[in-house]
């Protein structure tokens, strides 16, 4: 039964925002699973041939993980007003443990649906939400613990492996698949691509070491995994505020984020029309969407933290769960007894959610209602398969405050809540700092693994120094690469505007690319199977002066091309054996190639003579003067 509403009248949405895009020299391909509707996307980067004196030698295509959804598929028509295809709808329906509700369960959701003042903002193609049948649990963890491999788990296995095992027997990939041994620091990574099986995924989900955030009402989702024994993922933030940003901008920013590689998106909206903004984003997002429900609950009180109630928060959880939010940041570890521990901090409590709950606790002199009602929250989560992202409301806001009693006290409470959530078979990840100098990062990872039982860690950086406003994507990227290697499963990006203002599209791009670098560096360090393939391909292209391949194999082809063309814009420069840094006379790679070519061109007799002289020199004790 569908609910209809007038389409949004934003001019940019009416013109479809033109969100389709194509990556250079790339094709969109799909891996098919055990059933035809398990179609896992990947991007294949095509390479040009290597020119040699003997002719052209072809270079093979390079498969890469793809987060862009249908937006980069030339065969799919995108209509933002209709939303994306419901990839998971059939899987969910076949399981037979959910039911379509006759209407919305949330009081606030019903009010918004019937409010004529918001009709022009509303997403038009809404369907009634699903919920677990009475007594049922529909979480991926519940299925995994029952020994069931879901289509979502099979999808993840194919997505993580990229079917790289098929390349190992092909001679054209032999050199490209060489990889330095990693140091997984105790993690149980698969050793080879063929080890990334649906059963491996099931075991990781069942143990709680990984999650598949996949609300049953987010059928447009392309399933992915967050866990220490998978590829390191990154999250991008968006959201309107009371100061700036519009609904259309946020939809555009979501598509822009996944274009550059965001694995998940958090909608942190705090301004007008939070409900409508989230609906548009969800219906058009192929990646998991997370929120901080306390932000919207606070908005319902007019911004007065003391007026928050459990009933109001509960209604907000149900409202967002029925829209399809995949994971909730919930600051249930901010306990009354921890708040005084922040009094001597340099920057106090910097988490918005943490400060809201701290203020509520102090105003009422009661324990955090998110903590006291945690079991009831779990009942909601497992009815829709919403994952917990247990918030670090007492994270340090500067390196001076790192690793203090407030931070680690809350972390231990998050471990207690993790165990409680797992009794309900609810999926959990743990949020982490923040601002931590390099020498104190390892302690954060050790504490999380010990007290939170290896639940996936999800960190904001951390920023390793506080002296670089405007460059905090770099200060945090350094920490992110390190903690990613140590075991963090997902890295929350930081943009250059951190601490300064709301990021625009270019800031988002800069933050995502920075964090893609950090995540990939962590994968290399851990020894993720096949992680070095793209590095090797780009290095080979660089040595052979295949400029277009260098651009296209990079994380940001547009930026690389523009930097090259700033000094050598002519098309002929794209095949030149030098760049503007060294010029044609001093290029080390060009000189090395000339030396190789010279050695290869010498007659066999000359080579043999040089080898004989070399042996003679060694027999004489390698002395220059005798």
Swiss-Prot record:
GO terms for biological process: thiamine biosynthetic process; thiamine diphosphate biosynthetic process. It catalyses: 5-amino-1-(5-phospho-beta-D-ribosyl)imidazole + S-adenosyl-L-methionine = 4-amino-2-methyl-5-(phosphooxymethyl)pyrimidine + CO + 5'-deoxyadenosine + formate + L-methionine + 3 H(+). GO terms for molecular function: 4 iron, 4 sulfur cluster binding; carbon-carbon lyase activity; zinc ion binding. Substrate binds at residues 237, 266, 295, 331, 351-353, 392-395, 431, 458. PANTHER family: PHOSPHOMETHYLPYRIMIDINE SYNTHASE, CHLOROPLASTIC, THIAMINE BIOSYNTHESIS PROTEIN THIC. [4Fe-4S] cluster binds at residues 579, 582, 587. Its EC number is 4.1.99.17. Keywords: 4Fe-4S, Iron, Iron-sulfur, Lyase, Metal-binding, S-adenosyl-L-methionine, Thiamine biosynthesis, Zinc. Belongs to the ThiC family. NCBIfam families: PRK09284.1 (NF006763), PRK13352.1 (NF009895), thiC (TIGR00190). This is Phosphomethylpyrimidine synthase. Zn(2+) binds at residues 435, 499. Its cofactor is [4Fe-4S] cluster. Pfam families: ThiC-associated, ThiC_Rad_SAM. Homodimer. Pathway: Cofactor biosynthesis; thiamine diphosphate biosynthesis. The keyword Nuclease does not apply. Catalyzes the synthesis of the hydroxymethylpyrimidine phosphate (HMP-P) moiety of thiamine from aminoimidazole ribotide (AIR) in a radical S-adenosyl-L-methionine (SAM)-dependent reaction. InterPro entries: ThiC, ThiC-associated_dom, ThiC/Bza_core_dom, ThiC/BzaA/B. Binds 1 [4Fe-4S] cluster per subunit. The cluster is coordinated with 3 cysteines and an exchangeable S-adenosyl-L-methionine. GO terms for cellular component: cytosol.
């Amino acid at each position: 039964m569908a609910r209809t509403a007038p389409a949004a009248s934003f001019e940019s949405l009416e013109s479809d925002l033109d969100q389709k895009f194509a990556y250079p020299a790339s094709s969109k391909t799909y891996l098919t699973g055990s059933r035809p509707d398990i179609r896992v996307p990947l991007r294949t980067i095509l390479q040009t041939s290597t020119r040699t004196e003997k002719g052209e030698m072809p270079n093979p295509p390079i498969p890469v993980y793809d987060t862009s959804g249908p937006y980069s598929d030339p065969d799919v028509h995108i209509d933002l007003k209709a939303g994306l295809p419901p990839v998971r709808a059939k899987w969910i329906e076949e399981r037979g443990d959910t039911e379509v509700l006759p209407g919305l369960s949330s009081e606030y959701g019903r009010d918004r649906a019937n409010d004529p003042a918001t009709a022009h903002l509303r997403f038009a193609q809404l369907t009634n939400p699903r919920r677990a049948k009475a007594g049922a649990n529909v979480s991926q963890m519940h299925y995994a613990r029952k020994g069931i491999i879901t289509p979502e788990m099979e999808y993840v296995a194919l997505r993580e492996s990229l079917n790289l095992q098929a390349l190992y027997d092909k001679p054209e990939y032999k050199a490209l698949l060489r990889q330095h041994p990693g140091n997984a620091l105790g993690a149980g990574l698969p050793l080879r691509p063929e080890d990334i099986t649906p059963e491996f995924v099931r075991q990781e989900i069942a143990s709680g070491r990984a999650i598949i955030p996949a609300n049953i009402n987010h059928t447009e989702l392309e399933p992915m995994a967050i866990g220490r024994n998978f590829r390191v993922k990154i999250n991008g933030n968006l959201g309107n505020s009371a100061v700036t940003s519009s609904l259309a901008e946020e939809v555009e920013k979501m598509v822009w984020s996944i274009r550059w590689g965001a694995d998940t998106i958090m909608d942190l909206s705090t301004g007008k029309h939070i409900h409508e903004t989230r609906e548009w984003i969800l219906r058009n997002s192929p990646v998991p969407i997370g929120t901080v429900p306390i932000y919207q609950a606070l908005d319902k009180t007019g911004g007065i933290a003391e007026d928050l109630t459990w009933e109001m928060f509960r209604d907000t959880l149900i409202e967002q769960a029925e829209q399809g939010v995949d994971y909730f940041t919930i600051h249930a570890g901010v306990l009354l007894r921890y708040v005084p521990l922040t009094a001597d901090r340099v920057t106090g409590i910097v988490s918005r959610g943490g400060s809201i709950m701290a203020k509520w606790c102090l105003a009422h002199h009661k324990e955090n209602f998110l903590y006291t009602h945690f079991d009831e929250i779990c009942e909601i989560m497992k009815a829709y398969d919403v994952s917990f992202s247990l918030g670090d409301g007492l994270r340090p806001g500067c390196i001076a405050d790192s690793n203090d009693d407030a931070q680690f006290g809350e972390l231990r409470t998050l471990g207690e809540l993790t165990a409680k959530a797992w009794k309900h078979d609810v999926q959990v990840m743990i949020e982490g700092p923040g601002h931590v100098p390099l020498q104190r990062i390892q302690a954060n990872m050790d504490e999380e693994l010990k007290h939170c039982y290896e639940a996936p860690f999800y960190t904001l950086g951390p920023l390793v120094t506080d002296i670089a406003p405007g460059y905090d994507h770099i200060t945090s990227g350094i920490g992110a690469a390190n903690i990613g290697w140590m075991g963090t499963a997902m890295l929350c990006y930081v943009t250059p505007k951190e601490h300064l203002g709301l990021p625009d599209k270019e800031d988002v791009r800069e933050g995502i690319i920075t964090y893609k670098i950090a995540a990939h560096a962590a994968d290399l360090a851990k020894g993720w199977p096949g992680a070095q393939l793209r590095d090797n391909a780009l290095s080979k292209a660089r040595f052979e002066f295949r400029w277009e391949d260098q651009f296209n194999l990079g994380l940001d082809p547009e930026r690389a091309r523009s930097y090259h063309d700033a000094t050598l814009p002519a098309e002929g420069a794209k095949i030149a054996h030098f760049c503007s840094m060294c010029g044609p006379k001093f290029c080390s790679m060009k000189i090395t190639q000339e030396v190789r070519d010279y050695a290869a061109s010498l007659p066999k007799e000359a080579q043999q003579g040089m080898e004989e002289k070399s042996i003679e020199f060694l027999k004489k004790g390698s002395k220059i003067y005798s």
